[in-house]
């Protein structure tokens, strides 16, 4: 429980760093393990950092022996869907082989509490909305498949081994720490909210909307945006749940509220008071028109209730991106 050391793998990244903040606030000792290929050293502010790669078993063994964590939170992964189609081998090497190496090291060290960052991309194209955890899992790209393979491995580790896990399937993570210490910072950026904010700030030539003829209330895609601090809270609750002996479980993390791209852009204009050019272009292959979570199970199992709405997501993201010293 509180006071325990937690190894946060990928803890220098966007969601991992916000989770370190929440862990520290709740009395845990987060130790970041990161190769800093996508993470940021300046995001490691709430505990020590150990540099290393999840494919390096000897380095993992060394770090686990040194810090003796009670649980592992695993965020480290390649995440860009488009890149996964161009270079699937890297995604399998990092997301599958890397995770299996981490799991082997964890088992050898006697760690049996593991929280895994998964994704709603494991569901593939939704057959019904909102999606609950019983929805079939038929991922449609290599990124989603790598996460699904790890989910299956974790189920086997639970059934035939001694490792219990909480699999957290995120919907659209967004927003930033309200004190502006950390926020979303990807290179290159592909997520809608930072791209639209950059357009409002004049840092890019407007914003492109992929598809305006979907069967949704205004023709644009619907997504479930969840504040990164709500995600962080769910991860800390998942650690507590496992350390108290909870059984392995997979949970959706979303608000249950869908927002269209047009609604999102309108909300960003309202917060920023800066109109920006929007271009409507053709649909993007593989995009689902609606992805919204049923989050009842996370509420039941973890007592988790999202605290922040879309306006708070956008306000915190705006404050972060508008800081002139950011990147």
From Swiss-Prot:
The active site is at 143 (proton acceptor). Substrate binds at residue 119. Gene3D superfamilies: NAD(P)-binding Rossmann-like Domain, UDP-galactose 4-epimerase, domain 1. InterPro entries: NAD(P)-bd_dom, NAD(P)-bd_dom_sf, UDP_G4E. Pathway: Carbohydrate metabolism; galactose metabolism; Glycan metabolism; exopolysaccharide biosynthesis. It is an enzyme of class 5 (isomerase). SUPFAM superfamilies: NAD(P)-binding Rossmann-fold domains. Its EC number is 5.1.3.2. Keywords: Carbohydrate metabolism, Exopolysaccharide synthesis, Galactose metabolism, Isomerase, NAD. It catalyses: UDP-alpha-D-glucose = UDP-alpha-D-galactose. Its cofactor is NAD(+). GO terms for biological process: galactose catabolic process via UDP-galactose, Leloir pathway; polysaccharide biosynthetic process. The keyword Isomerase applies. One of its GO terms (molecular function) is UDP-glucose 4-epimerase activity. Pfam families: GDP_Man_Dehyd. Belongs to the NAD(P)-dependent epimerase/dehydratase family. NCBIfam families: galE (TIGR01179). This is UDP-glucose 4-epimerase. It comes from Rhizobium leguminosarum bv. trifolii. The gene is exoB.
